[in-house]
């Protein structure tokens, strides 16, 4: 079961148990008890709505490997662990920027080598 389903099941069980308990008490107290439960559940429902919005919003773009003839731009290869021989651009770019910033320059990944400019 996924997390959202578990949360919903838990909340429903909680609500049912509270309603049963309130019914045994009977009378006006039952309505007050149910109103309190609903107030407690509202923030949780809001959080669940935010989570579903985040999941259904447009997907984040995947990182593409460096433009090189020996690399293919398939999503399968992007998802594979990066071998030490073939590093993806963002990793190399971060390393290049660190190396070149010591010299007061910017770095660029060019054919898997750092170029300072």
From Swiss-Prot:
The organism's place on the tree of life at top rank: Eukaryota
Organism: Lychas mucronatus
Tissue-by-tissue expression: Expressed by the venom gland.
Predominant location category: secreted
Name of the protein in its database record: Venom protein TxLP11
Secretion signal span: 1-22
Disulfide topology: none
Cellular component GO terms held in the UniProt record: extracellular region
Localization, UniProt: Secreted
Post-translational modification: Contains 4 disulfide bonds.
Record key words, sorted: Disulfide bond, Secreted, Signal
